[in-house]
Amino acid sequence: MHLPLPVRVVSLIALAFCAGCVGVPEGIEPVTGFQVERYMGRWYEVARLDHRFERGMEQVTATYELRPDGTVSVLNRGYRTDKGEWGEASGKARFLGPPDVAALKVSFFGPFYGGYNVVDLDPGYRHALIAGPNRSYLWILSRTPTPPSAEVERLVAKAKALGYDTSQLIYVKH
């Protein structure tokens, strides 16, 4: 099949752009010894850096479920304060390498993936620090809507040490 030149050029640009959307930010290491089964279930978003796809959302949760093929189904849900209604997005995640390294790519729209890297996780799998593909994306997650403040402070300090602008964190209402 022969595609017109403009279609090929746009496709190549889109592929090049998306290649930068997956991976681990420089100087950051994903968790090793990761046990995906223990990570499954519901997580509450405690804090995040601002980005358009969650802007104005409160009561945000992420629910993960392991599929038989080793991929992970993702359901993100939150209350849209501007519209006065609940919104949700479902997607899928795949490991970038071996499943004991917490570096994944997640897609909510067709073949377009973004980085999802667990960079801190307590031994009980109760609190997690998630890095996106660059330092513009960061989340603090917890198994409960109101985790201990000491744990949140620890994760914020870790994010700051990794080069994130933690003064820009948005703390999510539940």
PLM region spans:
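A beta-rich soluble binding module of mature secreted/lumenal proteins
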Residues: H2-L3, C21-H174
